[in-house]
Curated annotation (Swiss-Prot):
Alphabetized CDD domains for the sequence: GAT_STAM, VHS_STAM
Keyword presence, Iron: no
The name this protein goes by in its record: Signal transducing adapter molecule 1
Tissues expressing this chain: Widely expressed, including the pharyngeal intestinal valve, several head neurons, and phasmids in both males and hermaphrodites throughout development. In males, also expressed in the gonad and sensory neurons in the tail. Expressed in the male-specific ciliate CEM, ray B-type and hook HOB sensory neurons.
Pfam families with a match to the protein in the record: SH3_1, VHS
Transmembrane segments: none
GO molecular function, one term: ubiquitin binding
GO biological process terms, semicolon-separated: endosome to lysosome transport; ephrin receptor signaling pathway; negative regulation of MAPK cascade; protein localization to non-motile cilium; protein transport to vacuole involved in ubiquitin-dependent protein catabolic process via the multivesicular body sorting pathway; response to hermaphrodite contact
Organism: Caenorhabditis elegans
């Protein structure tokens, strides 16, 4: 069939909306086949059809999703191979997995049955549909069923199977009646057990044990040692403390024995005593002798020696360990708390030194900043004060005036040495460094001293 021009996305959505409307109760096969023809007659029909189907498959209404699955199955069977490749693409395979594992039972079952049908038909001949086969295998491995789960058919099959079994219960009423009967029987059994417990005691009475004592009088007595303290709660019980030696007169009952301490006799729990009389004391004395008290102190030599001895030990056990290994290990373990405390104090000192270092750096930074600011102000003041100091002008000294006594003689005006002044706005040229400018008193002009004789005018 010759391909026509591509249809718009809206045409697919309109047609798909009609054949998957929520009001439809039965599949509209005429519309479904028209949708398949639209995909086959379109250049991009496979991709556009998949996009429109994806929207309907993700609808919230399960009825719409069931109709969309029917449309998808029909397109799989009636469209070309390109459509099946789009369905088996990595992007759409996640949609299929979500539908197969959906919480809606009918949707999940229908999608799994559709995948099962695809695997049994087209996927066997077309190698490009391998992702569908992989999805089917993963679902089977996860325990999903590919059979319709119909509760009614299950109950019918079970009823037919156990129709001749008298113990089979087919109705809810029979099951409820049986449950009530079982509960009543359990209640009666509990009452009987409570009555038995009230008439009997937790341990054999003294009267019951007296024949045993008489019959077992020929059995040799033995001594046991108390492990824990026991205080008698009844008159026929025997009280003792840990370490007491008890003579056993009857041990026919595995839980309560009869014994005596001196003139006192009675029952006591067998788990409170032991047959080992001197083993514990000997072990305590041996351990006290083998493990002398270790004075805890940090000693690097002991740690180094312990490591050397451990390296020399034989891991196979063929050669015995050195004799001083136990003492070295005990001394090394005793230093653990002291070493931890010493390391903690070192950490505290390191932290305090780090804080002091930061404070010193801050102070030095402030000092450098102050020095830089002070040097700039000093240079700026020298630039404006030194020209005034260099050119310090003074008025000529006042001279006394005497009236002329004779003829006035013309006198040439006194010639002063020429002075060169800087032009306005020009910066003065310094002949010496700024910090070595002489004082203004040294740069004053020397005026000629007045003559001692009055001048004649």
């Amino acid at each position: 069939m010759k391909k026509q021009k591509s249809f718009p996305m809206s045409a697919y959505e309109d047609l798909l909306g009609k054949i998957t409307a929520p009001t439809i109760t039965v599949e509209n096969w005429e519309g479904i086949l028209a949708f398949c023809d639209m995909i086959n007659n379109d250049f991009e029909g496979s991709k556009t059809g998949i996009k429109s189907l994806r929207k309907r498959l993700n609808n919230r209404d399960p009825h719409v999703v069931l109709l969309a699955i029917s449309v998808l199955d029909s397109c799989w069977a009636n469209c070309e191979e390109r459509f099946r490749k789009e369905v088996s693409s990595a992007q759409f395979i996640n949609e299929l997995k979500a539908l197969c594992t959906s919480s809606q039972r009918q949707v999940a079952e229908k999608m799994r049955l559709t995948v099962q049908k695809w695997v049994d038909t087209e996927c066997k001949t077309e190698q490009s549909l391998s992702l569908i086969v992989t999805l089917h295998k993963n679902l089977v491995a996860d325990g999903y069923s590919f059979v319709v789960d119909d509760p009614k058919s299950k109950t019918k099959a079970i009823d037919a199977k156990f129709a001749n079994d008298p113990n089979y219960v087919g109705s809810a009423q029979e099951e409820e009646a049986i449950a009530k009967a079982i509960a009543a029987s359990l209640a009666d059994a509990e009452k009987q057990e409570k009555a038995k417990k009230s008439t009997s005691t937790m341990y054999p009475s003294a009267k019951a044990s007296s024949p045993a004592v008489q019959t077992n009088s020929n059995i040799p007595e033995k001594n046991v040692r108390a492990l824990y303290d026991f205080e008698a709660a009844e008159s026929n019980e025997l009280s003792f403390v840990a370490g007491d030696i008890i003579t056993i007169t009857d041990e026919s009952n595995p839980h309560w024995w009869t014994g005596r301490i001196g003139t006192q006799q009675g029952l006591f729990p067998s788990s409170f005593v032991t047959n080992q009389l001197d083993d514990l004391k000997s072990k305590e004395t041996d351990s006290s002798q083998k493990a002398p008290e270790v004075v805890a102190s940090i000693n690097e030599a002991i740690l180094v020696r312990c490591l050397q001895v451990l390296h020399e030990c034989d891991p196979t056990g063929e050669r015995q360990d050195p004799e001083d290994l136990a003492q070295l290990e005990a001394a090394s373990y005793a230093q653990g708390n002291l070493i931890d405390a010493h390391l903690a104090s070192i950490d505290r000192q390191s932290n305090s030194l780090a804080q002091i270092d930061v404070a010193i750096r801050d102070v030095l930074a402030l000092y450098d900043d102050a020095i830089q600011k002070g040097g700039f102000q000093h240079q700026s003041q020298g630039m404006y004060q030194q020209p005034m100091q260099q050119y310090n002008y003074q008025q000529p000294p006042n001279r006394a005036y005497y009236p002329p006594t004779g003829p006035v003689q013309q006198q040439q005006p006194q010639q002063y040495p020429p002075q060169h002044y800087p032009a306005p706005g020009a910066q003065p040229q310094y002949a010496c460094p700024p910090n070595s400018v002489p004082q203004p008193q040294q740069q004053q002009q020397q005026w000629p001293a007045p003559s001692s004789q009055p001048q004649q005018y």
